[in-house]
Amino acid sequence: MVNSVVFFDITVDGKPLGRISIKLFADKIPKTAENFRALSTGEKGFRYKGSCFHRIIPGFMCQGGDFTRPNGTDDKSIYGEKFDDENLIRKHTGSGILSMVNAGPNTNGSQLFICTAKTEWLDGKHVAFGKVKERVNIVEAMEHFGYRNSKTSKKITIADCGQF
């Protein structure tokens, strides 16, 4: 299986911040990687484009991917509402690791987070399935708009997304 590369064009209050590219680990985690890839391209009729990063905690992560509600209270995958944890072997080794948000075992949907630090306490609990390949500095810049209480000071949006 090919490890696809997707991109997110990020804006802050409508102003361009930059483009990040993300390599997906489809060779080891194919179902999760395919969900993310298809949500990035929009080929199933719904996508990440226009959704926001609603939760940012400096020194931890940036969370987004709720394209049905902008507040993180919903989740939808290309497989239906939720899908099972596929492979928990990848570790949360540091900044740029892409992982699934969940509400417990086997509750993956569309929400994701990008680590901004090593988060080993998430190993074995959240599916890590990709890594920022280029422009991790954009993710680090997003951190500046977050607070310890997870609120954001500005609207951080995925203005466009797709596959290279």
From Swiss-Prot:
The entry's cellular-component GO terms read:
cytoplasm
Looking at the keywords, is Isomerase present?
A: yes
PPIase cyclophilin-type domain spans which residues?
Answer: 7-163
- InterPro entries, alphabetized: Cyclophilin-like_dom_sf, Cyclophilin-type_PPIase, Cyclophilin-type_PPIase_CS, Cyclophilin-type_PPIase_dom
- Write out the catalysed reaction: [protein]-peptidylproline (omega=180) = [protein]-peptidylproline (omega=0)
Q: What is its EC number?
A: 5.2.1.8
Family annotation (SUPFAM superfamilies): Cyclophilin-like
The UniProt entry's sequence similarity note says: Belongs to the cyclophilin-type PPIase family. PPIase A subfamily.
Q: What is this protein called?
A: Peptidyl-prolyl cis-trans isomerase A-like 4H
Its lineage opens with: Eukaryota, Metazoa, Chordata, Craniata, Vertebrata
